[in-house]
């Protein structure tokens, strides 16, 4: 299929289909979606959720307290927003059931760059997927059911066509009322069309924004007289009116009001009757115009607070259904957001060194969290991400304790994802010769940006503390392990020798026997054996050597029976592997011959160095990054 035929097919599927009123009513009998409300159609577009039993995943079970959670595939790209999306879907579900929510404005409240606009755009795109039925030619896309009177016609429509009476709450528009007079009351002359909502053509989807307080009026919402038609029609004639307002265009669909509370209050008045009564007045002496759609608004907290604190706005506030859209507070989900943004940019295939996105996500999340009492904020961040800190930080509290003490506004302040992505852009372009990102450049760019942003002194100090107290030290540890792991593979034989010698000495020490070295003939008594064992144990801080030695020897004896009497590899027992690594890297000088980029003393050293670079590249670094990060690590270790 060519692109042209593909486009043509897509266009054909959304073309109008025309019916007589009788055919439409017969269709209602067979298909409930023919008279579905906007909320019902949006629920259809969202689809059924996937139920996730968090008890089967230790991380999720800690985050969601072992509950079964709902995840909607339609919102798969919105990471870490399960609670917010659940509330939005609940609003549509209740509105679809005809409850109070159908008379309320869905209001997304959150900080800048938190995802409000993205959610609004997603809802508008979802709305485009499900068609609706309207009277042909109606400038406000009104439902054919608006032609009927619930009190007079409701019983007949329910008995003959199965249409519940609650769907007959709409009124006829002034345009339809004029046509009815022209048809002499013969409603069968009305034609019905099947339409797909369209953002592009403003069919059942509209967007309005606040304008200048001095010149914006309600015509942006309700339309106005078309001056060009006044030659043909009187000013109060339905055909002289331009139904161009957002409420007119969004009937039976969704109207988005961007930064709603920045608009003058007089502009918002039509929304009161549109939500509560399902209709609103025009700017002229016409009859009321129907509105059976969804009102979606969003703005930042500052506008909401000033609006709420004004007593004159109480009637309006009562008609608002608030859904908070805070910043993401889980590091793993914040990383997914960055990955999504990178995928949609030309940096999708650029090199990003391991831990770069994680470090930026940690910094962003730390800026959004409230500092806990009697516990550090870094531990709180890890608990929020579902980590178990029982063994590593005994002062860490449970996730629920942290949430309770933080209050309901956590996540409504801090650095936005937008800010973080701008930082990431600078990091990728930091090196003039290579489009790539790494944590060392990230630390530098973050520090520079914090100085330039002119944050309040307290906030600035707090952000710098995050870098120096939490992120930099942990990255030194991380890159150290990366380098050591790549280095270690050059010295696997050395590691095995230490392992074998440790097991041998520990075995003789436990049995309280002297050990004679078969090569040198040197005899080691129990005290000498203990000294040799401690040389390996002390760098790792082993607090109970006796138990540790017994544990290791028992493990090796069991392993030998399954390995033809040979010792297992030194990597096979985690506890001893860590001890040996600490022993091997207790002196930075041991690393220098392999990881430094100075001239090598021998071909053997050069080969090991080349092997080290190859292994680092395999781990996700560019050759240039290997050099930069290795030299940075050696400098830092030396200064410590």
Where in this protein do the model-derived segments appear?
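N-terminal accessory segments that target, anchor, or regulate ATP-driven/P-loop NTPase machines
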Residues: 1-52, 113
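Conserved ASCE/P-loop NTPase catalytic core
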Residues: 33-640
